[in-house]
Amino acid sequence: MLFTGDFETTTDVDDCRVWAWALCEIGNVDNFLYGNSIDSLMELLFNLDSKITVYFHNLKFDGEFILYWLFKNGYTFNSKRKYLNEKEFTTLISDRGVFYTIEICYYKSDTKRKTLKILDSLKILPFSIAEIAKAFSLPISKLEIDYKEKREIGHELTQSEIDYIRSDVTIAALGIEKLFEQNLKKMTTGSNAITEYKKIIGKSKFSKWFPPPVYDDDIRQSYRGGFTYLNPIYKNRDVGEGIVLDVNSLYPSVMYYNKLPYGEGIFFKGKYEHDNVYDLYIQMFSCQFVLKKDKIPTVQLKNNLAFVPTEYITNSGGEYVTMCMTNIDLELFLEHYEVFDINYISGWKFKSSDKLFKEYIDKWNGIKVKATKEKNKPMRTISKLMLNSLYGKFALNPNVQSKYPYLGEDNIVHYRLGPQETREPIYIPVGTFVTSWARYKTITSAQKVFDRFIYADTDSLHLVGTNPPENLDISDTELGCWKIESHFRRARFLRQKSYVEDEYCDIEDIEKYINDNPDLVNHIDLNNNTILKITCAGMPSSCYKYVNWDNFKIGNEFAGKLKISHTTGGIVLLDSPHTLRE
């Protein structure tokens, strides 16, 4: 049987416990169970006469209560996942503290073993519960309760509390059911995507195209994320009217149209020499450099103590810097910087094709277009997940390290690092070239509108002025084209991923916004028909109601943030202000 699960917990560090739990069967949401202690939940699960899997949404939180219960009830942690004995459990927790699974063996005989598997639904539905309800057009929505109300041990749940927790597990169950209907049953969205891709092209073709590279470490040095950059002349400045452009499906579009590597790479020394067959390459080189006038910087140096890893740099400071780039990034680098004393060290070259992912993207983009026309939000949501989750799986890091839980002398669950482990990589060349082409699209587009350019974030451009750029391909629907997403009356950009825009909206959108966000009516300006849209890395949406145009400034604090505190019993969320920092 498959269930979704949820805990409601106290907010007192001296009395941390589960005061309510709920289960909802996936595929049969009328099967709803609830109780008021973690003891009663575990007793129920261990007495169900079938193989049980429970999905908690954000297992990192709920999972710690389960781990504490296991330790206090005589269970022992075993890092060897395949060899669990009775009253042993194992976990899959990354070195960064990301929870994937908890597996518990609660009965074992010579002929039978009973286990309970607990997974994180956030890994397959990367949205909040409220967002899942909207994204899948579910007939129910997330409710509200007073989290801080004092609830004694044995508290009998009120009907409103039952309704609240039932809505949460039901929404998650219905969302997961939609995925299962498409046979998407893996542990993460990336695993679902690559499994589907293998079905489409065939496992033998996959193995031929993407042999696991023994040179993963070399290629991985060229792997970077999306391009996010604030034009310094607009930092901490109020900006007048402008527009926001988004690429229609950036990563799927570069996978569809651009040449990507396949097959075994060939190592070369020195500078790459033109090769009609092996026409994509990774180049290691060293040089000094200075940004050219009126050019956007394209270089970040992640593993060099002389530079801030998140900043795009304008010069090498008179030092020789060693870098590793795809030929796509290298082309941009040489175009945007004056380069001195370049020394080409070595690299890897690859065959290429622009047809590797066409069939996969044709299928899921077709589903997305059809779902959009039919206003089928569940299928549109699933198709977007499948389109955007594939490329990252190719960049899976083979060097991993888990965290192991233990109960400390302070009666609190702690985590220690396990040994370094190695798993087989998939094919990092695809991951690095997909992200490289995506950066190329965004950077070259921003450079074309340099005189208007304010800010870029992966697949978006924010520009001064309201006229559509004539030198960019504009379309509301065409894959890889720029779409005019919004028009703002004014904006303020503090730093990367931290800005507000007074966005023009029609009356219908304003009414819908009020209905969906009753706490945020202070963001609406009916005189100008605008809504204050907030983007702020690290600031939870619970802070937004305290933000306005005047106070969105460096140094200001905002209530509404919850800080995790590990304590006896599990985790307590404590009120903590969010401060806007440089």
Which residue stretches match the model-derived regions?
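Conserved acidic
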Residues: 1-2, 13-54, 64-582
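A short beta-strand-to-loop transition that corresponds to the Sensor-1 phosphate-sensing loop
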Residues: 56-59
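Conserved Rossmann-like nucleotide-cofactor binding loop
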Residues: 10
